[in-house]
């Protein structure tokens, strides 16, 4: 069935998904914070700031008015950076239709509270609306989806009916959506993989090889799984699209912003220099801090995350961090 969908956030991923949904025949309004971006997308059918070179579907509408975006919608897709979710969705509450399903595609952990995105929603939404929350995540570079390259992701919701409805709304012949009931696991996979991707980028920037990257991906997956289990997630989720799938993509793909940040750090640039030149958000930078503090709070051993925190926030050298990881006390593999 055709949905009336409000897409909140016009970065590369929000714009791509809005375009996909419009092409599928849904009635879609894309909300952007920047009035000038709304005007450009209306006039030129292109988001030159975040998704240059992609012609947007003629059915797609644009606004920077939250009330207009939400009017009469049956589904909401929120794709703002994770550190902005609380503010944007709190501002949205007066306009949010009570019957609308909410789909979260933000990947991160709130720095100030250590809350996952679904925990933020749980705090601000009425209980009945939180019951129809879903998380959409998986290995999906926006540009590849915009170019209709085959992609598979996961929609997680505690309600099977909600997961099915999201699955049906988003699935096309090039974008396949699988269902899952493990919202916590799907969210954590999407958040923690960004930190490991920065680590993989640092390894590449230092000139290390495929062995090193494979070790980081594998042990990063173990850390992600440990944290997830401590928070009530299912271990099997991390072997799926939202865990291993997204981790491999983000640690190896040339379109990965987080890996790019890491490569530049490995080559000797400072984090402040790198972030000062970026238009788009590299979620892994903030998530490094929140994941480090969350692991300490829960008593979960996450040595890669710990070394990443010391590199990004305490000026530890990358080579020193690598040496510490390689000379830790010897252990059985396991998780």
From Swiss-Prot:
UniProt GO cellular component terms: cytosol
SUPFAM superfamilies: 6-phosphogluconate dehydrogenase C-terminal domain-like, NAD(P)-binding Rossmann-fold domains
Class in the EC hierarchy, top level: oxidoreductase
Entry superkingdom: Bacteria
Cytoplasm found in the keyword field: yes
Active site: 193
This enzyme's EC code(s): 1.1.1.94
Function: Catalyzes the reduction of the glycolytic intermediate dihydroxyacetone phosphate (DHAP) to sn-glycerol 3-phosphate (G3P), the key precursor for phospholipid synthesis.
Protein name: Glycerol-3-phosphate dehydrogenase [NAD(P)+]
Species the sequence originates in: Citrifermentans bemidjiense (strain ATCC BAA-1014 / DSM 16622 / JCM 12645 / Bem) (Geobacter bemidjiensis)
